[in-house]
Amino acid sequence: MQTLHVELGERRYPIFIGSQLDPKQLLEPYIHGQQVMIVSNVTVAPLYLSHYQEALESLGKTVATCILPDGEKYKDIQHLNLIFDALLEAGFNRDCTVLALGGGVIGDMAGFASACFQRGVYFVQVPTTLLSQVDSSVGGKTGINHPLGKNMLGAFQQPQVVLADMAQLNTLPERELSAGLAEVIKYALLGDEDFLVWLEENMDGLVARDADLLAEAVYRSCAHKARIVANDEKEQGERALLNLGHTFGHAIESYLGYGTWLHGEAVATGMVMAADLSQRLGWISNEDVARTKKIIQRANLPISCPQIPLDDFLGHMAHDKKVLNGQLRLVLLKQLGQAVITKDFDVELMKQAILANQHG
């Protein structure tokens, strides 16, 4: 087992990364109070809920559960309310803990619920997908979608602890595994070319679910994110770099309808668009773009999206949270392994990059 810490002063917390982790031993120091609400979904609960419920009950905790439907399209205010209903019906108090057992949607919703319930209760993350292990479970961003934009309602809510168990990735559908690899590739492209080389050498093993390689990929990804979050928790500056591919990707997700494409799939094509625009600006080479596309394809991810009318695409981009004073800011590549956030780009070139990476 490997341990990383997200350094946030007195709110410092550990990320435990390994296979067949013992929840009783690892969670005991971090569960405050006697009441624990496990939030999961209909896919994950039959696989792992009893394991965590029994571990917590053996610690003398009162455990209640809230099982939600599975999917991004349920990440809304109506389903968030089901968590509040469960907490209130169980009579839980402000000293309770909300434990997220699932992927990014469950983590986002359970975290947001924990930030709101009685103005804030304790929160624990047990991410069961690769994407949530390397991205959404680390750093405290929680929230839900609104019909007009993704993650428009939310709060920063740091967990007490994160448990990333590689054994749980064995039950992950192939498409979900690939979606997680998109975020892993993102860390390499935005800040670590050595990691990109490692991914190029080990992508076949990652796709084949080699537990040691997955643990190394999760560790390196989380270490990268933890460093950025420690420097910029509330995304005032450097943390925005973690949105490489996301402005384009969110537009794809929003237009197609949440859940039609997985988040990681949309981000993958978004990173291709960002690389394409970076090349059109003269920042990276054609070879760099080809290298970006190749590693994304090797992870069984899309490098183009269905045709989306340009006005619709741009309209969805305009709802992005990185819009500042009416100006769209994009995360682009100065070179592979070095990203920047900028508003200094030619909009016509951006349109070309969008259109060039769609298929009929």
UniProtKB/Swiss-Prot annotation:
As for family, the record states: Belongs to the sugar phosphate cyclases superfamily. Dehydroquinate synthase family.
GO MF assignments = 3-dehydroquinate synthase activity; metal ion binding; nucleotide binding
Query: Where does it reside?
Result: Cytoplasm
> InterPro entries annotated for this entry?
Dehydroquinate_synthase (IPR050071), DHQ_synth_AroB (IPR016037), DHQ_synth_fam (IPR030963), DHQS/DOIS_N (IPR030960), DHQS_C (IPR056179)
Q: What does this protein do?
A: Catalyzes the conversion of 3-deoxy-D-arabino-heptulosonate 7-phosphate (DAHP) to dehydroquinate (DHQ).
Q: Which GO terms describe its cellular component?
A: cytoplasm
Task: Give the reaction(s) catalysed.
Answer: 7-phospho-2-dehydro-3-deoxy-D-arabino-heptonate = 3-dehydroquinate + phosphate
Q: Does the keyword Nucleus apply?
A: no
Q: What is this protein called?
A: 3-dehydroquinate synthase
Q: What is its EC number?
A: 4.2.3.4
Where are the bilayer-spanning segments? none
Swiss-Prot/TrEMBL cofactor(s) = Co(2+); Zn(2+); NAD(+)
Q: Which leading EC class covers this enzyme?
A: lyase
User: Pathway listed for it?
Assistant: Metabolic intermediate biosynthesis; chorismate biosynthesis; chorismate from D-erythrose 4-phosphate and phosphoenolpyruvate: step 2/7
Keyword Transmembrane present in the record's keywords: the answer is no
Cofactor, free-text remark:
Binds 1 divalent metal cation per subunit. Can use either Co(2+) or Zn(2+).
Identify the residues that bind NAD(+): 70-75, 104-108, 128-129, 141, 150
Q: Where does Zn(2+) bind?
A: E183, H246, H263
Q: Which GO terms describe its biological process?
A: amino acid biosynthetic process; aromatic amino acid family biosynthetic process; chorismate biosynthetic process
Pfam families named among the record's database cross-references:
DHQ_synthase, DHQS_C
Supply the alphabetized keyword list.
Answer: Amino-acid biosynthesis, Aromatic amino acid biosynthesis, Cobalt, Cytoplasm, Lyase, Metal-binding, NAD, Nucleotide-binding, Zinc
